Amino acid sequence: MTTSPVTATRARGSALSAVSSPRHVVVIGAGFGGLAAAWELARRGVAVTVLESDDEVGGLAGSFDVGGTRLERFYHHWFTNDRHVNELVRELGTEDEILYRPTNTGMYFSQKFFKLSTPGDVLRFTPLSPLGRIRLGLLALRARRVKHWQVLEHLTAEEWLTQLGGREVYRVVWEPLLTGKFGPYAGEISAVWFWNKLKLRGGSRDQRGAEMLAYYRGGFAALAERLAEAIREHGGTIRLNTRATGLVMQGGRITGVKAGADVLAADAVIATPALPIVADLIEPHAPPDYVAHLRRIRYLANVCLVLELDRSLSSTYWLNVNDPSFPFVGVIEHTNFEPPETYAGRHIVYLSKYLPEESELWRMADPEVLEYSLTHLQRMFPAFSREWILGSHVWRARYSQPIVSRHYGSMIPAVETPLPGLFLTTMAQVYPEDRGTNYAIREGRKTGQVVAERLRTQRADSGIRGAEAPEPGLVGA
């Protein structure tokens, strides 16, 4: 009889940890960061409960049904060098479910389409002068020479990119992308953020220079569900449609989480939502200066229109839009990456826009977003017809992208908070990398390890929780 990797991990639980008595940890949020933290705890024999306000696990990688298959609400892929997700998938025994495929990238500039997937494409990019093309090609190589991101902390992306490639390359290629993504904050964005983008994409190419990306069979939802299943197999609990509404503090430490009328007692709590949400949760208990510190990091929201079409829009997977009059920073044709047969022959197109909450587009009703977007899409693709549309969906995320400004490293809160028993693992703490499922998994696992170690080394009489406290789990409010 063969033993599954998950079962084998459970059998090794005592070797992973020396937790001598039952402990209980509550994880707030079932995105990949929260699930990874819960998995790290559960496989060490720690009792864990995950609270998720949505009706499914996955967080920003949440999904909906298209043609009988789950599709991400917001576009997702992995790079070939995303080792943390690969390690997790191997532990779950589902590495054969990762699909690696070549993709292509393009740019829409001055009402024309250009390929930008290979070095040859760069040399044929006519919006730049011959010297500008050479500078653009060398820019990525020069950027990769930077080994220590700290030397870039004092620079904005504009300053650094102009130094590397000149003003022409910045004006044509980089400025429209920064403005399209960060809007009024484009001039504040750190060079570190852009350096990591170049480093990451440069490391996900084959020997010929073509970009390779990865996807999970059945979508990211399938991986999130498999991870949730593994947590349950190790004794963990995941409660969907359950919003954390507050924290309980006793004896100078966090001892539980409120979920409506219920309270879950806990030896430790890991909070994974966006920092403004965490700030609201802890405000009754935390020092005012710490709450203010959490609120220092600003976020952009995201509106994502997903179109189901009866035919392909173009042959490009990732189309950067370097046209300031176009409201979306990119047109991502998902089915040029994952084939349309996966979705009953439907072609999937994402139109994504990061924006402040005060923006008109954020306030539009869903039908208005569709009408507004189609006008611009038809300008870009004159042959496009509304008759191609088989379905449309508008998804919104209030806290989608932290604004990574200069000296961002000094703004990031530590995993351990001033409130004993409360730990943080959020997308805003992913740095110098940008947020994404690979790094959410990395940070979640690291936090789970920290919490497990605290529970292992501290005794009940040290203040974690006395013997007179309630048993782990649900107690009366």
Where are these regions (language model features)?
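Extreme N-terminal leader/targeting segments of oxidoreductases
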Residues: M1-V25, R43-R44, G466-E468, P472-G476
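Mid-domain catalytic core of redox enzymes
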Residues: R44, T242-V349, Y354-R363, P367, ...
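Glycine-rich FAD pyrophosphate-binding loop
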Residues: A42-V66
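Dinucleotide-binding Rossmann-like beta1-alpha1 core, especially the glycine-rich loop
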Residues: G67-Q150
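N-terminal Rossmann-like FAD-binding beta1-loop-alpha1 element of flavoenzymes
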Residues: R23-V50
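Conserved Rossmann-like nucleotide-cofactor binding loop
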Residues: G33, E56, P276
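Active-site/ligand-binding neighborhood in enzyme catalytic cores
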Residues: L128, G137-L247, T272
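Conserved flavin/dinucleotide-binding core of flavoenzymes
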Residues: T3-S4, V331-A477
